[in-house]
Amino acid sequence: MTASIVYLNNVRLETGFAKDHHELTYTKTARYTLAIQEGKIQAIIPQNQVTEKQQGTDLNGQLAIPAFQESHNHLDKTYLSLGWRASQPVKNLKERLADEASELKLLAPSTEQRATAMIEKLIGYGASYIRTHVNIDPYVELENFWGVKRALEKYAHVIDYDIVVFPQHGLLKNPHTVLLMREALKNGGTMVGGLDPAGIDYAIEESLETIFDLAEEFQVGIDIHLHDTGEVGVYTIDKFLDILEERKFTQRTAISHAFALLDVRPAEKEKLYQRLATHQTAIMSTIPYDPRYLLPPIDVLRQAGVSVHLGSDGFFDSWSSNVSGDLFEKLRNFCEMTGKITEEQLTQAY
């Protein structure tokens, strides 16, 4: 049976740019009716051409924009629904991991409840897609995975999602971790994650090869965290792309954070950026507002054809007390940090 068509009338859409009498650029808009069937826009009809049969819900000129994609998140880490608690300061990533490990077992039973609260907040901010990394580790094994999976399945009619099985406390440190990763991928994990093959696993090649082994076994994509900077971080990105090329890997690939992209030698930048673009390896940034971290060169990457996506990372968890989960706020931060002020620049960023 064919689903009926839903009509949204008097929807304001952007149509282009124009200049006013002061030669200032502004965005032109016009009103339309959107014909939607089975969740997809089937037709965009100028409002003055709408027939009686196409009358539906009047949106009174509200502006319609594409839904947001929450491209880097940790649904299992949030404290949402448990009441207020602040994060504890640490000196480095290893201290942060130790701090997190101390509370993992306490938080695990409430994973579904907490993830549900976070999903609802993200949907409220306009997200129609969530890519969440979920801890797979010896402390909680698959408990967080099952809780997040149940939470996401409740909203499958509203959002699309990916579950990245993520060895937050190292892929190679405990032989049980790879077995747990494999079990999660058998049961609904959609991507393989990783964490700092040098800084955490101390074995760049072995860590990356293991990640690609898992991805090939289950025919899924890869999205690794890479905080390592300097030549080590750049080498890791190069080695990631080398392995991708050697294996002729065709699933989706992404590198999250990728701070080392700022440390690429000038003579090598064009080649590396082109490799990322050629293999459609996306960069996932959380627009860190933190002087200890550096924003990857997003504008230069995009000009080189590299796909860049934004996410909130974790918010209201042991890692951060401050992030809201509002992706529009992330975009504003990005525009402020990179000096985007003109109508064209703002529109392109959004």
Predicted regions and their residues:
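N-terminal metal-binding scaffold of metallo-dependent hydrolase/deaminase domains
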Residues: 1-51
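C-terminal helical cap
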Residues: 11-16, 122, 277-282, 286-292, ...
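Alpha-helical scaffold segments that flank or form the walls of functional sites
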Residues: 64, 81-133, 139-154, 180-186
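Histidine-centered catalytic micro-motifs
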Residues: 66-78, 134, 221-230
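Active-site gating loops and adjacent loop-to-helix segments of metal-dependent hydrolytic enzymes
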Residues: 79-111, 236-254, 272, 324-338
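Active-site core of metal-dependent hydrolases
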Residues: 165-174, 186-295
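His/Asp/Glu-enriched, well-ordered alpha-helical/loop segment
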Residues: 246-253, 299-350
